[in-house]
Amino acid sequence: MPKINILNQQGDLVSEKVLATTVFDIKPNQQVLYDVVNAQRAAMRQGTHATKTRALVAGGGKKPWRQKGTGRARHGSIRSPLWRGGGVTFGPSPRNYSVKVNQKVRILALKSALSLQVQNNQLVVLDNINLATHKTKDFQQMLQKLNITSKSLIVVTQMTEQLALASRNLSYITLETASHASVYQILNCKQLVLTADAVNYFEEVLK
């Protein structure tokens, strides 16, 4: 069973915790990770792209000239895709890109992502995060004491206003609650920072 050091905000060792093998020490399923990350990234797409077909472009109801006798090519509408200002053929239309993923697959992907971070020694566990102020400077000093200087995901169980304000101006920090942390977010960081409560939450929900 994997053990992890629990640190305080000053970077000092407070205690050790034995992580649940069924959550933090499974063999990562690469195919499941691939499928779930693709589904989560697809769900982020707005899908609001749109073009107008010849039926949607204004005008063009009248035949521009008679069928025969002019010497010119026959046309029925000035909004044909052949014309400048005409409709678009087979252009994109608004659609929903989301893909359904079964709950068991999502759970397995989350376990795989957490286990992968543990195996890569990219997991940091804090006993708690309590900020006296909402200043980014104070929060950044705490991160420096913990040697967190690269792209990181910080997962807490309760989002406080002070923590949200202090972290929002740091481009390399993503703050998320344990109930909303996604597989894509966990994999897309150099360091995963969990509070002890967040670890307990994952072990309880994913057991």
UniProtKB/Swiss-Prot annotation:
Domain of life the protein comes from: Bacteria
Listed Pfam families: Ribosomal_L4
Single Gene Ontology BP annotation: translation
An annotated Gene Ontology molecular function: rRNA binding
Regions of compositional bias (Basic residues) in chain numbering: 63-77
HAMAP family in UniProt: Ribosomal_uL4_B
Subunit (UniProt): Part of the 50S ribosomal subunit.
Protein's job: One of the primary rRNA binding proteins, this protein initially binds near the 5'-end of the 23S rRNA. It is important during the early stages of 50S assembly. It makes multiple contacts with different domains of the 23S rRNA in the assembled 50S subunit and ribosome.
Annotated protein name in UniProt: Large ribosomal subunit protein uL4
Organism: Aster yellows witches'-broom phytoplasma (strain AYWB)
Gene name as annotated: rplD
